[in-house]
């Protein structure tokens, strides 16, 4: 009788241990799901993507986002949230300038959620590029080489709005010199502490652009 009781007690103790482990695991999973929505997580995620982008080539980032589309979606989702706290969004000023002219051919390089296109008159012909997008009108490409999509001297305005990431970002500028028409314009909007302005301006002037 004692043996049966000891055996039953052992079984009940084992079941309780399994149940406690299951509850603890569920609690851990619940805590994790909450944590990924915290401000700290989002800031860390954005910083990690920026660090990766600033130390990698555009071809590497293109492959990364194509293989990890959820990372692209999460990045731009958080970025759209952050924009609500900005005192000014440069995309609005660029749109204002683009709307001064109709019937342009415009290339938006690193278009993100493709918002700029919605702010500009519908008379213009539009090419939107990014590493990845769920928008079927966006061309998934490495913007350092767009020969497959843009002919020489075919674009009136090229836009780089918060998109000069990558160790080879000057290649984007050089490539724009190829497809821009004579007299075409490049619009660049970047944080002052992100890009070496002297290097950017010197490089642009060196390949034939004027300020």
Where do the model's predicted regions map?
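Terminal intrinsically disordered, low-complexity, charge-rich regions
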Residues: 1-30
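Short catalytic micro-motifs in class I SAM-dependent methyltransferases
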Residues: 161-163
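Short alpha-helix
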Residues: 193-211
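Class I SAM-dependent methyltransferase Rossmann-like catalytic core
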Residues: 17, 25-101
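A short glycine-rich, Lys/Arg-flanked "PGG" loop and its adjoining helix->strand segment in the class I
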Residues: 170-185
């Amino acid at each position: 009788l004692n043996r049966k009781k000891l055996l039953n007690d052992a079984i009940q103790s084992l079941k309780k241990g399994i149940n406690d482990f299951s509850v603890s695991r569920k609690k851990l999973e619940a805590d994790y799901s909450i944590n990924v929505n915290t401000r700290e997580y989002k800031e860390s995620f954005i910083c990690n993507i920026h660090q990766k982008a600033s130390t990698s080539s555009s071809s590497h980032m293109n492959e990364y986002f194509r293989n990890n589309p959820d990372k692209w979606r999460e990045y731009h989702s958080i970025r759209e949230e952050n924009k609500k706290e900005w005192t000014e969004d440069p995309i609005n000023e660029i749109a204002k300038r683009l709307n001064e002219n109709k019937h342009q051919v415009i290339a938006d390089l690193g278009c993100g959620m493709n918002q700029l296109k919605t702010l500009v008159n519908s008379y213009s012909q539009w090419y939107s590029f990014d590493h990845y997008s769920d928008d079927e009108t966006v061309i998934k490409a490495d913007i350092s080489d767009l020969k497959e999509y843009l002919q020489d001297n075919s674009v009136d305005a090229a836009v780089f709005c918060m998109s000069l990431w990558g160790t080879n970002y000057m290649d984007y500028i050089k490539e724009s010199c190829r497809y821009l028409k004579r007299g075409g314009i490049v619009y660049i909007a970047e944080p002052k502490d992100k890009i070496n302005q002297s290097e950017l301006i010197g490089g642009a002037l060196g390949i034939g652009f004027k300020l």
